[in-house]
From Swiss-Prot:
It comes from Encephalitozoon cuniculi (strain GB-M1) (Microsporidian parasite). Keywords: Chromosome, DNA-binding, Isopeptide bond, Nucleosome core, Nucleus, Ubl conjugation. Its main location: nucleus. Monoubiquitinated to form H2BK123ub1. H2BK123ub1 gives a specific tag for epigenetic transcriptional activation and is also prerequisite for H3K4me and H3K79me formation. The nucleosome is a histone octamer containing two molecules each of H2A, H2B, H3 and H4 assembled in one H3-H4 heterotetramer and two H2A-H2B heterodimers. The octamer wraps approximately 147 bp of DNA. GO terms for cellular component: nucleosome; nucleus. InterPro entries: Histone-fold (IPR009072), Histone_H2A/H2B/H3 (IPR007125). This is Histone H2B.
Length: 130
């Protein structure tokens, strides 16, 4: 008895060969690490100028993202050092407020601390609502 040809089931063969697949892969972006703040920078620019008088180029957005990243990194490093000096393993809101008090001066300090308190009150209200 002759054996019939075995029919293999599974995925259909890809129309792209290996060389074409390498070409079609998405290139990784070469933007700065601070590009995670891109949406925040755009939102703030819309809040500052609701009638769209301010137009930001991609380079200016990258610069502002880099500045934001550096600032957040500096605050986080200082807050971490303050927490370690006290003997804590976690950074709390009081450490972040202390870092702002050390780094900033004048009206910017007051504004930053007020924003931290607003964020904390929103977070606590949200957790109470659950």
């Amino acid at each position: 008895m002759a054996k019939s040809a075995r029919h293999v089931t599974g995925k259909a063969p890809s129309s792209l060969d290996a060389h074409d697949r390498k070409k079609s892969k998405k290139k990784s972006s070469s933007m700065c690490v601070g590009s995670m703040f891109k949406s925040a920078v755009k939102r703030i620019s819309r809040e500052v100028s609701p009638d769209n008088n301010i137009m930001l180029t991609s380079n200016s957005i990258q610069v502002l993202c880099g500045i934001s990243y550096d600032f957040v990194d500096t605050v986080a490093d200082l807050a971490g050092e303050l927490a370690r000096k006290v003997g804590k393993q976690t950074v709390g809101s009081d450490d972040i407020i202390s870092a702002f008090e050390i780094l900033l001066k004048g009206e910017l300090r007051k504004l930053a601390i007020r924003e931290v308190h607003n964020a904390l009150s929103k977070s606590q209200a949200k957790s109470r609502g659950k």
